[in-house]
UniProtKB/Swiss-Prot annotation:
Keywords: Membrane, Transmembrane, Transmembrane helix. It is found in: Membrane. GO terms for cellular component: membrane. Belongs to the CD225/Dispanin family. The gene is PRRT1B. InterPro entries: CD225/Dispanin (IPR051423), CD225/Dispanin_fam (IPR007593). This is Proline rich transmembrane protein 1B. Residues 37-47, 75-86 have a biased composition (Low complexity). The chain crosses the membrane at residues 190-210, 238-258. Residues 1-107 are annotated as: Disordered.
């Protein structure tokens, strides 16, 4: 009796019989209807969301991170659109792929027999020239007879006919005879230098004799350039000495005439 009383007391204290484990295969129990007499709880105000930066757009929302659940449903379409962005842009642009999609076709040289078919020969058209107008005046007669034709370098065989003209000129690649230019040798003006030294001007005459001797020595050793330069200087000094002597002589004559015949 005590045990029964104790068991009943325990049931009354525990709030009924002990709880039996629920079967997961059993259907869910319907929710208890709300009592209309119980006062409704007021809804809590929603706090505004904190503005997020661009780096936080791809990160899961604060509510999902705090609850350990999946990202918010509003972030899922944005993430899906970001993943499909490059593919859709490349597909929409229609730009070809830069790399080779497959192996290039092997190179095959053209068949030499098919060359006449691909490139037909150029047709030979006869060239027709208009006759030249007749000259108004007859051509002048030749003053000198034409030079005789030089003999052929290689005589053709007997009875052979060539369809092309044969020229008996100098062979190509063989240099012709070198033309030698004969220039007159420069003059040393030695005699003129001595005369102007004696009768015109002693100083410039002596310098002219020096250049005349230098020109003669250059001619003796075959240096034509040095001989021409020395000869040109000797000639200039001879002319200067001659003009100076003529000027001095004329001035002396005028002075003598004026001194003798004028009071």
């Amino acid at each position: 009796m005590e045990a029964g009383a104790g068991g009943a007391g325990s049931d009354t204290k525990g709030g009924g019989s002990p709880a039996t484990p629920e079967d997961p295969r059993s259907p869910a129990k319907p929710a208890a209807p709300e009592d209309p007499q119980m006062p409704a709880q007021p809804a809590l105000p929603q706090l505004p969301r904190r503005p997020r930066t661009l780096d936080e757009d791809g990160a899961p929302s604060e509510d999902g991170a705090a609850g350990g659940s999946e990202p918010a449903p509003e972030d899922a379409p944005a993430q899906a659109a970001g993943e499909a962005g490059p593919v859709s842009k490349a597909a929409a642009g229609g730009a070809p792929h830069i790399g080779f999609v497959g192996e290039p076709p092997p190179y095959a040289p053209p068949d030499p027999k098919a060359a006449p078919l691909l490139y037909p020969p150029f047709p030979q058209v006869p060239v027709v020239l208009q006759p030249a107008p007749s000259a108004l005046f007859p051509p002048p007669a030749q003053l000198y007879p034409a030079a005789p034709t030089p003999p052929a370098l290689f005589s053709p065989p007997a009875g052979a006919a060539f369809p092309f003209p044969v020229y008996n000129g100098p062979m190509a690649g063989v240099p012709g005879p070198a033309t030698v230019e004969h220039r007159p040798l420069p003059k040393d003006y030695m005699m003129e230098s001595v005369l102007v030294t004696l009768f015109c001007c002693l100083l410039t005459g002596l310098i002219a004799i020096v250049y005349s001797h230098e020109a003669r020595a250059a001619l003796g050793r075959g240096d034509l350039a040095q001989a021409e330069e020395a000869s040109r200087k000797a000639r200039s000094l001879v002319l200067f000495s001659l003009l100076f002597g003529v000027f001095v002589s004329t001035s002396w004559v005028i002075y003598v005439v004026v001194a003798l015949y004028l009071p």
